């Protein structure tokens, strides 16, 4: 759930923009699920299809945000990033399907610039 809605809102950005997202992990995982998968209450974010750095607080899918913790993600969209529709979703191996089934996804639209040839 993003900003109390599922799916999350559409994020619209231009090439060269910075997208900042604060992920607050409020996963409420039942005890039965935790027995099956002890990591089920951990999560993270991935900007699928983006051409951004995987380092630091960028698109680092190795980060695991524990239940009750927060993480700020900073996505610096390159000036030459192609336009198109991307999506942001959890990407923590072993827990992704549970989060996606709960609606944790949102669209990210990178707008075309005047030189874009994608004809959007």
Feature roles, as predicted:
Residues 1-120:
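Histidine-centered copper-binding motifs that mark active-site loops
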């Amino acid at each position: 759930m993003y900003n109390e809605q599922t799916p999350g809102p559409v994020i619209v950005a231009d090439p060269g923009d910075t997208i900042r997202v604060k992920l607050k992990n409020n996963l409420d995982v039942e005890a039965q699920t935790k027995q099956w998968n002890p990591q089920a209450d951990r999560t993270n974010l991935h900007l699928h299809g983006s051409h951004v750095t995987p380092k630091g607080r960028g698109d680092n899918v190795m980060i695991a945000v524990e239940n009750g913790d927060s993480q700020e993600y900073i996505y610096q969209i390159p000036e030459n990033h192609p336009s198109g529709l991307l999506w942001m979703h959890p990407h923590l191996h072993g827990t992704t399907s549970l989060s996606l089934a709960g609606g944790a996804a949102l669209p990210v639209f990178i707008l075309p610039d005047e030189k874009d040839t994608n004809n959007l």
